[in-house]
């Protein structure tokens, strides 16, 4: 009976979206506008409880790269007829002073980088690799997808609006874990390997369109592998395929990304 109720709920809400670039169908119980509104509150909460670095060369670099990737995303989606997917994004980029190799992007374009990952990035191109990957998660609504899955698993047949309005603490917990925001906010619910692979593929295209050489992505992967020393990868990479598989896949997906990159170099 529960499965029937859940199926009916999903159908009634028209809870199916398509991931740009890959074309994969996904479950999305929560409207994008609602996710974006929740992101504003949660993003401000994180920033208020963190040491945010402003005005330094590093902070300015993160902001600059973020703006270029965001512009590339908007350009790509416009070309594909999907400009509406990010029309309500209000991009923000914050650098948080914490020695963890982590970064994330909430719905609506709310991005955070942690200082602990900058050494692995090394330069703007490395930051673009991470930025493109994290923004791709938001564009592909991966967090919304796994939050929807969490609602189905944890709240059963409870109506969505009831779950959100009458169980705000549980909903907030699902939201925070769905976006993998630091351990102090609860256990991270990792992105699936499918999500990570999609974000890698999309991120390559976005960084290429922003004028950053996508061939830097496998190099970043090699530095990340060296950083992990064969142990558990840093938090934001925790559910990626193995380093060797990821690097192989990045190289395999290089063709389309390089096409966009070369166009930017030729002024097209």
Task: Describe each model-derived feature in a short phrase.
Residues 4-12:
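Sec-dependent N-terminal signal peptides
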